[in-house]
Design a protein with these regions (language model features):
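Phosphodiester-processing cores and adjacent nucleic acid-binding clamps
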Residues: 1-204
Length: 204
């Protein structure tokens, strides 16, 4: 299956994707996948629509699964329009996947926090999720959401790429500490590294 996918709902803040939910799900079935996840860019508002499509698909493909998720922008605690530092602040990509109804509720709560504190910066609405949000909501009741490291826009892939170039051991220790923190937040067996097949040399 494929666990990191976007639909037209990723266009809420930027032009990103033209795929419709129905087309994505039907194509996953056509390819013989057992599961497909929908992880739009800080957007969970298509959940009801996806559930309706999934119910119809499930009649003919009872073993097929659709996972509801969200690709958040993970930032340091307290980041806002007034204290953003171009030198070191980033809106790191990070994927959340709901394992059950409780997990989807947790993802919605995290998304709500991000949108409530959102702000305009450099021509785009920024929707930061703080590490503290993950601690408050997921760490408080772990086991319902899977976290993955996302693409090269994620904190871990970026740091791994820099480590590969520099072999700096301090950076390596920070990478390990970050992964340990994520496993602590999500719970054992609920934090994963994302791997994407791609021709991009940096992703190999």
């Amino acid at each position: 299956g494929s666990l990191h996918n976007h639909t037209q709902y990723s266009n809420l803040r930027l032009r990103d994707c033209i795929i419709k939910e129905k087309d994505l799900i039907e194509y996953a079935v056509e390819l013989g996948h057992e599961v497909v996840a929908i992880t739009d860019h800080e957007a969970v508002c298509n959940a009801v629509k996806v559930e309706k499509i999934y119910k119809k698909i499930k009649k003919d493909h009872p073993d097929f699964k659709v996972i509801l998720g969200n690709e958040i922008y993970l930032c340091r605690n307290g980041l806002n329009a007034n204290n953003f530092n171009r030198e070191y602040d980033r809106y790191w990509h990070f994927v959340l996947l709901a394992k059950d109804a409780i997990g989807h509720k947790q993802i919605r709560e995290i998304s709500t926090r991000a949108w409530r504190r959102s702000y305009m910066a450099r021509g785009m609405r920024r929707v930061p999720t703080y590490y503290q949000d993950l601690i408050d909501i997921i760490r408080a009741n772990p086991g319902h959401v899977i976290g993955t490291t996302a693409c090269l826009g994620g904190a871990l892939p970026t740091q791994l790429l820099k480590y590969r170039q520099t072999k700096n051991e301090k950076r390596n220790k920070k990478i390990i500490a970050w992964c340990e923190q994520m496993e602590w937040i999500f719970g054992e067996g609920n934090f994963y590294l994302e791997l994407q097949p791609a021709a991009n040399a940096e992703q190999k």
